[in-house]
Amino acid sequence: MTRLFSWAAALSVVSVFSVSQVSAYVGEVHNYTRRATTGNGWDIDGKSFDYVIVGGGTAGLVLANRLSADGSNSVAVIEAGPSGYEDNDKFIVPSAMLYDSAVNTQYDWQYKTTSQKHLNGKEKSWPRGKVLGGSSAINGLYYVRPSREEADAWAELAGKNGWNHWGWDNLLNGMKKSEKLQTPLKSVREQAHIEYDGSSHGRNGPIHTTWPAVTYGPVGAFIESASKVAVPRVKDAYGGENHGTYVALSSMNKRNWQRSFSRNEYLDPISDRNNLQVLTGHLVTQVIFDRSDKNHVQATGVHYKASVDEVEHTVHANKEVILCAGAINTPQILQLSGIGSSDLLNRHGIDVVVDLPGVGENLQDHISFGLSFRVKNDKDVAPQQITGNKKTDSYVNSAVSYVNFESLF
């Protein structure tokens, strides 16, 4: 039986509902005092914003920043998890992801996959960030890109206008716009055998990328061994060909050796914008629709709660409701709001707003696994703990080999 919480299509991470097609319309702008992230659901209850963004994660905070930039639009963001400020080191210290991880804590949705036939029926953990910054706050800091073939496949799937917005060339421009590449330290570059092409990277974006301030012998040894035995080294893994062995960039700021993610790069610098309100600790339960015109259903707001037993709140959208709740929660909210397979919705007693069978189906994620081995000299490996030294604690193991799994079978 298909479950209401079934996996989402990978391309449905961000869904946008247009409320007004009148370009001259100017929505109401709330003149708040200095904006602060709040956990009080009453602070936005009953109010109207031009844009209501559901999910303060990797994509949601980027949109909040850009939509509120010129001051003419009011923006509300609703994040299910906490702000994370009270546990800041868990997010900003890179090696914390190895020794003090936010995975399997309150900052993680702690999802598990369904039983996997080719893993002897096992269910596997699938971490998803439940905090401001989303998965960009709790991941392993790997900064990698898809291959040209994958990006171009998205354009094909998007239909006749897909090449106007998707495809490798368009996506590369966007990826470079968001990136600020910082060169590796000479000692690290030599020891880890780091190779890259600067022309494939951005230099002025909010997200800082670089390599850790320290590295260790096994990293360079892995690059040499894997490239000779199995997967050849790739010299420009960010230019459209990522199949190969290389040391991946980390989303890290070389100035302070801290994680660079959507919260501290897109939200924190704009904390004084009075047209932006961020609510944490509240789940959106349903999108509200105006169905007066059966041929043009419009989203006009959302309902949200602090928990199942708490009071339900409502916030209204003048222009758009934007779902940025991730690959699982975005389609879940759509289904709970009546958008999805009519057969599934009817079985669960949900009023069908739009019969759209693809919602919540066909998600496939990449497979990854690590290699473990003993070393003869334990002085040539990371210290296995957070040390308090910023350079030492910047270490994350980012030596990778990407292969086309279809070629293995």
For each of these PLM feature ranges, what is it?
Residues 3-409:
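N-terminal redox-cofactor-binding region of secreted/periplasmic oxidoreductases
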